[in-house]
Amino acid sequence: MEGKEEDVRLGANKFTERQPIGTAAQSQDKDYKEPPPAPLFEPGELSSWSFYRAGIAEFVATFLFLYITILTVMGVVKSSTKCSTVGIQGIAWAFGGMIFALVYCTAGISGGHINPAVTFGLFLARKLSLTRALFYMVMQCLGAICGAGVVKGFQKGLYENNGGGANVVAPGYTKGDGLGAEIVGTFILVYTVFSATDAKRSARDSHVPILAPLPIGFAVFLVHLATIPITGTGINPARSLGAAIIYNKGHAWDDHWI
Protein backbone atom coordinates (compact mmCIF):
# COMPACT_ATOMS: atom_id res chain seq x y z
CA MET A 1 0.00 0.00 0.00
CA GLU A 2 1.15 3.52 -0.74
CA GLY A 3 1.15 4.70 2.86
CA LYS A 4 3.46 1.86 3.92
CA GLU A 5 6.09 2.09 1.18
CA GLU A 6 9.66 2.42 2.35
CA ASP A 7 12.81 3.65 0.64
CA VAL A 8 16.16 2.04 1.51
CA ARG A 9 18.82 4.72 1.97
CA LEU A 10 22.33 5.00 3.38
CA GLY A 11 22.13 6.41 6.87
CA ALA A 12 24.62 8.64 8.67
CA ASN A 13 26.17 5.57 10.31
CA LYS A 14 26.86 4.05 6.84
CA PHE A 15 24.24 1.34 7.36
CA THR A 16 21.12 1.12 5.29
CA GLU A 17 17.98 2.39 6.94
CA ARG A 18 14.38 2.32 5.87
CA GLN A 19 12.45 5.56 5.67
CA PRO A 20 8.78 5.95 4.78
CA ILE A 21 8.05 7.57 1.45
CA GLY A 22 4.95 8.84 -0.27
CA THR A 23 1.93 9.61 1.91
CA ALA A 24 3.59 8.09 4.99
CA ALA A 25 6.45 10.58 4.77
CA GLN A 26 4.02 13.46 4.32
CA SER A 27 2.08 12.46 7.43
CA GLN A 28 5.25 12.73 9.55
CA ASP A 29 5.72 16.35 8.55
CA LYS A 30 2.16 17.46 9.11
CA ASP A 31 1.67 20.04 11.83
CA TYR A 32 -0.38 18.82 14.76
CA LYS A 33 -3.69 20.62 15.10
CA GLU A 34 -4.76 21.45 18.63
CA PRO A 35 -8.32 20.46 19.52
CA PRO A 36 -10.71 23.38 20.08
CA PRO A 37 -10.84 24.74 23.65
CA ALA A 38 -13.53 23.38 25.91
CA PRO A 39 -16.59 25.64 26.25
CA LEU A 40 -16.87 27.63 29.46
CA PHE A 41 -20.32 26.21 30.16
CA GLU A 42 -21.57 22.93 28.75
CA PRO A 43 -25.13 22.31 30.03
CA GLY A 44 -25.36 19.07 28.05
CA GLU A 45 -22.86 17.46 30.44
CA LEU A 46 -25.38 17.56 33.27
CA SER A 47 -27.59 15.04 31.49
CA SER A 48 -24.73 12.66 30.66
CA TRP A 49 -23.97 9.60 32.80
CA SER A 50 -20.28 9.80 31.89
CA PHE A 51 -20.14 13.22 33.59
CA TYR A 52 -21.34 11.82 36.93
CA ARG A 53 -19.28 8.67 36.53
CA ALA A 54 -16.17 10.84 36.18
CA GLY A 55 -17.08 12.71 39.37
CA ILE A 56 -17.57 9.45 41.24
CA ALA A 57 -14.17 8.27 40.00
CA GLU A 58 -12.56 11.45 41.38
CA PHE A 59 -14.35 10.95 44.71
CA VAL A 60 -13.25 7.32 45.07
CA ALA A 61 -9.67 8.05 43.97
CA THR A 62 -9.25 10.95 46.41
CA PHE A 63 -10.87 8.90 49.18
CA LEU A 64 -8.39 6.05 48.68
CA PHE A 65 -5.51 8.52 48.33
CA LEU A 66 -6.21 10.13 51.71
CA TYR A 67 -6.93 6.83 53.43
CA ILE A 68 -3.63 5.18 52.48
CA THR A 69 -1.40 8.23 52.82
CA ILE A 70 -2.72 9.40 56.19
CA LEU A 71 -2.42 5.87 57.59
CA THR A 72 1.20 5.88 56.42
CA VAL A 73 1.83 9.23 58.09
CA MET A 74 0.26 7.98 61.32
CA GLY A 75 2.49 4.92 61.30
CA VAL A 76 5.62 7.03 60.93
CA VAL A 77 4.66 9.69 63.48
CA LYS A 78 3.75 7.21 66.24
CA SER A 79 7.07 5.37 65.94
CA SER A 80 9.58 6.09 68.69
CA THR A 81 12.63 5.75 66.42
CA LYS A 82 13.26 6.46 62.76
CA CYS A 83 14.84 3.05 62.29
CA SER A 84 11.63 1.21 63.15
CA THR A 85 9.53 2.84 60.44
CA VAL A 86 9.60 3.76 56.76
CA GLY A 87 10.44 7.39 57.55
CA ILE A 88 10.03 10.35 55.22
CA GLN A 89 11.05 8.24 52.24
CA GLY A 90 8.21 5.82 52.95
CA ILE A 91 5.67 8.64 53.22
CA ALA A 92 6.89 10.09 49.94
CA TRP A 93 6.62 6.68 48.27
CA ALA A 94 3.09 6.24 49.63
CA PHE A 95 1.96 9.56 48.14
CA GLY A 96 3.76 9.06 44.83
CA GLY A 97 2.79 5.41 44.51
CA MET A 98 -0.88 6.07 45.19
CA ILE A 99 -0.96 8.86 42.62
CA PHE A 100 0.69 6.57 40.07
CA ALA A 101 -1.84 3.79 40.69
CA LEU A 102 -4.91 6.01 40.91
CA VAL A 103 -4.08 8.11 37.85
CA TYR A 104 -3.57 4.90 35.90
CA CYS A 105 -6.94 3.55 37.09
CA THR A 106 -9.01 6.70 36.54
CA ALA A 107 -7.34 8.34 33.53
CA GLY A 108 -9.80 6.74 31.12
CA ILE A 109 -12.81 7.76 33.21
CA SER A 110 -12.18 11.25 34.54
CA GLY A 111 -8.67 12.10 33.40
CA GLY A 112 -7.20 11.13 36.77
CA HIS A 113 -6.92 14.60 38.33
CA ILE A 114 -7.27 13.71 42.07
CA ASN A 115 -6.18 17.27 42.85
CA PRO A 116 -8.08 20.59 42.59
CA ALA A 117 -4.84 22.33 41.59
CA VAL A 118 -4.52 20.05 38.56
CA THR A 119 -8.19 20.50 37.71
CA PHE A 120 -7.89 24.29 37.99
CA GLY A 121 -4.78 24.32 35.80
CA LEU A 122 -6.49 22.25 33.12
CA PHE A 123 -9.52 24.56 33.31
CA LEU A 124 -7.32 27.62 32.76
CA ALA A 125 -5.84 25.86 29.74
CA ARG A 126 -9.41 25.29 28.49
CA LYS A 127 -9.04 21.53 28.60
CA LEU A 128 -12.34 21.13 30.43
CA SER A 129 -15.44 23.21 31.07
CA LEU A 130 -16.15 25.25 34.19
CA THR A 131 -19.07 22.94 34.97
CA ARG A 132 -16.85 19.86 35.00
CA ALA A 133 -14.03 21.63 36.84
CA LEU A 134 -16.29 22.71 39.71
CA PHE A 135 -17.89 19.26 39.92
CA TYR A 136 -14.47 17.59 40.04
CA MET A 137 -13.23 19.93 42.79
CA VAL A 138 -16.30 19.33 44.95
CA MET A 139 -16.02 15.55 44.56
CA GLN A 140 -12.28 15.62 45.27
CA CYS A 141 -12.79 17.58 48.49
CA LEU A 142 -15.63 15.31 49.61
CA GLY A 143 -13.51 12.24 48.90
CA ALA A 144 -10.62 13.68 50.90
CA ILE A 145 -12.86 14.47 53.86
CA CYS A 146 -14.32 10.96 53.83
CA GLY A 147 -10.88 9.34 53.49
CA ALA A 148 -9.49 11.23 56.48
CA GLY A 149 -12.72 10.57 58.39
CA VAL A 150 -12.43 6.81 57.93
CA VAL A 151 -8.86 6.88 59.27
CA LYS A 152 -10.04 8.79 62.34
CA GLY A 153 -12.95 6.40 62.77
CA PHE A 154 -10.64 3.39 62.81
CA GLN A 155 -7.93 4.86 65.05
CA LYS A 156 -9.32 7.95 66.76
CA GLY A 157 -6.81 8.12 69.59
CA LEU A 158 -3.81 7.61 67.34
CA TYR A 159 -5.22 10.09 64.83
CA GLU A 160 -5.79 12.90 67.32
CA ASN A 161 -2.53 12.37 69.20
CA ASN A 162 -0.35 12.46 66.08
CA GLY A 163 -1.57 15.48 64.16
CA GLY A 164 -4.10 13.81 61.88
CA GLY A 165 -1.88 14.26 58.84
CA ALA A 166 -2.67 17.98 58.77
CA ASN A 167 -0.25 20.34 57.03
CA VAL A 168 1.64 22.78 59.23
CA VAL A 169 4.82 24.80 58.80
CA ALA A 170 7.53 23.00 60.76
CA PRO A 171 9.49 24.78 63.52
CA GLY A 172 12.53 26.57 62.14
CA TYR A 173 10.76 27.63 58.95
CA THR A 174 8.81 30.82 58.32
CA LYS A 175 5.42 31.08 56.66
CA GLY A 176 7.23 32.55 53.67
CA ASP A 177 9.37 29.43 53.46
CA GLY A 178 6.26 27.28 53.55
CA LEU A 179 4.48 29.37 50.93
CA GLY A 180 7.47 29.24 48.59
CA ALA A 181 7.82 25.48 49.01
CA GLU A 182 4.13 24.93 48.23
CA ILE A 183 4.15 27.22 45.19
CA VAL A 184 7.19 25.54 43.66
CA GLY A 185 5.97 22.05 44.54
CA THR A 186 2.53 22.63 43.03
CA PHE A 187 4.10 24.12 39.91
CA ILE A 188 6.31 21.05 39.46
CA LEU A 189 3.30 18.76 39.74
CA VAL A 190 1.05 20.71 37.35
CA TYR A 191 3.90 21.20 34.88
CA THR A 192 4.56 17.46 34.89
CA VAL A 193 0.87 16.72 34.34
CA PHE A 194 0.72 19.06 31.34
CA SER A 195 3.89 17.59 29.86
CA ALA A 196 2.96 13.95 30.44
CA THR A 197 -0.53 14.37 28.97
CA ASP A 198 0.38 16.65 26.07
CA ALA A 199 -1.85 15.68 23.15
CA LYS A 200 0.86 16.46 20.59
CA ARG A 201 3.24 13.96 22.18
CA SER A 202 0.47 11.40 22.51
CA ALA A 203 -0.30 11.68 18.80
CA ARG A 204 3.37 11.25 17.89
CA ASP A 205 4.29 8.50 20.36
CA SER A 206 1.63 5.89 21.07
CA HIS A 207 3.30 4.80 24.33
CA VAL A 208 3.08 8.24 25.96
CA PRO A 209 -0.53 7.95 27.27
CA ILE A 210 0.25 4.59 28.86
CA LEU A 211 3.35 5.92 30.64
CA ALA A 212 1.79 9.24 31.73
CA PRO A 213 1.00 8.11 35.33
CA LEU A 214 4.66 7.22 35.93
CA PRO A 215 6.21 10.73 35.69
CA ILE A 216 3.23 12.22 37.53
CA GLY A 217 3.61 9.80 40.43
CA PHE A 218 7.38 10.25 40.45
CA ALA A 219 7.01 14.04 40.56
CA VAL A 220 4.70 13.71 43.57
CA PHE A 221 7.26 11.45 45.24
CA LEU A 222 10.13 13.90 44.70
CA VAL A 223 8.15 16.94 45.82
CA HIS A 224 7.13 15.15 49.01
CA LEU A 225 10.70 14.07 49.63
CA ALA A 226 11.79 17.71 49.44
CA THR A 227 8.97 19.48 51.27
CA ILE A 228 7.70 17.09 53.95
CA PRO A 229 10.24 18.58 56.42
CA ILE A 230 8.90 22.09 55.66
CA THR A 231 5.10 21.91 55.47
CA GLY A 232 4.24 18.23 55.42
CA THR A 233 3.64 18.81 51.69
CA GLY A 234 0.28 20.14 50.64
CA ILE A 235 0.35 20.67 46.83
CA ASN A 236 -3.16 19.19 46.88
CA PRO A 237 -5.84 21.50 48.31
CA ALA A 238 -8.28 18.60 48.76
CA ARG A 239 -5.73 16.60 50.75
CA SER A 240 -4.98 19.58 53.03
CA LEU A 241 -8.66 20.48 53.46
CA GLY A 242 -9.77 16.94 54.25
CA ALA A 243 -7.12 16.44 56.92
CA ALA A 244 -7.77 19.87 58.47
CA ILE A 245 -11.56 19.43 58.66
CA ILE A 246 -11.39 15.99 60.27
CA TYR A 247 -8.55 16.86 62.66
CA ASN A 248 -10.11 20.29 63.37
CA LYS A 249 -7.67 21.67 65.89
CA GLY A 250 -6.13 25.12 66.03
CA HIS A 251 -2.73 24.50 64.49
CA ALA A 252 -4.27 22.57 61.59
CA TRP A 253 -5.93 25.80 60.43
CA ASP A 254 -3.15 28.25 61.33
CA ASP A 255 -1.16 27.57 58.16
CA HIS A 256 -3.99 26.19 56.05
CA TRP A 257 -4.05 29.29 53.80
CA ILE A 258 -0.61 28.34 52.51
From Swiss-Prot:
Barely detectable in roots, leaves and fruits. Aquaporins contain two tandem repeats each containing three membrane-spanning domains and a pore-forming loop with the signature motif Asn-Pro-Ala (NPA). Residues 1-37 are annotated as: Disordered. It is found in: Cell membrane. Belongs to the MIP/aquaporin (TC 1.A.8) family. PIP (TC 1.A.8.11) subfamily. A motif (NPA 1) lies at residues 115-117. This is Aquaporin PIP1-2. One of its GO terms (biological process) is response to salt stress. The gene is PIP1-2. One of its GO terms (molecular function) is channel activity. The chain crosses the membrane at residues 56-76, 90-110, 134-154, 176-196, 210-230. Residues 77-89, 155-175, 231-258 are extracellular. Keywords: Cell membrane, Membrane, Stress response, Transmembrane, Transmembrane helix, Transport. CDD domains: MIP. It comes from the Eukaryota. InterPro entries: Aquaporin-like, Aquaporin_transptr, MIP, MIP_CS. It comes from Musa acuminata (Banana).
